Amino acid sequence: MSSSTNLMLKKLLALSLITSIPAACAYPSISEIKNPPEVDVSVNKEKAIKLEVVEKKWTCPTCNYNEKYVLEKLQEKTKISDRNALATIMGNIKSESNFIPNICEGGARVNYNQCHSGGYGLIQWTSIGRYNNLGKFAIKYGYDPSTLEGQTAYMINESVFQRYLPEFEGPGKTVDQYMVAAYYWLGWGIKGYRQHYAYNYTKKMILA
């Protein structure tokens, strides 16, 4: 067989290989690119696994029950999310009552209607108006005004707290800055250790 014949056979063989490439290996046409085939994205609802987004909250593992309860309700019933803001509120409550709801100013542990002078409760409600409103709120919503649950609900819903709530809900401030809003909320006469307590809470609280 001559060399020219061999060369021709090789060319024919190469051509046959090229033309026999499967269509799946070829590039898609313009129409296929513009109109891609539909993809089945249906879901079997019975077998589908629901993904739940768990929102993290500030917790205080070393705090007592009363402290944990108030911290939880502050986040559940408001939009406060800043650790310094929460710690400031907690520090002020600790300074006022040490989270003891049935405490009358001076230290006596009595029911709501047995505290006849000074402040009473978690934040030591002192003025006649604020003290009486605690009782009215409790009656209206079925709480005992001497309890942690009743006083926490009143504290969060009280008009004075609601007035300054936006200051606490605004994030990014220092404890010292949030303390200004706390002063107008509580109107304390003696600052005492409340800011020191607040800083301690910032160290004890964790996001979980």
Where are these regions (language model features)?
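Short, charged helix-capping/linker segments at alpha-helix termini
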Residues: 76-84
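Peptidoglycan-targeting cell-wall enzymes and recognition modules
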Residues: 48-69, 97-173
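Non-catalytic cell-wall polysaccharide-engagement segments
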Residues: 2-6, 10-12, 17-40, 131-208
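N-terminal export signals and maturation junctions of secreted/periplasmic proteins
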Residues: 11-77
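Short, functionally critical alpha-helical segments immediately adjacent to catalytic or ligand/cofactor-binding
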Residues: 84-100
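Poly-acidic low-complexity segments
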Residues: 4, 38-44, 99-103
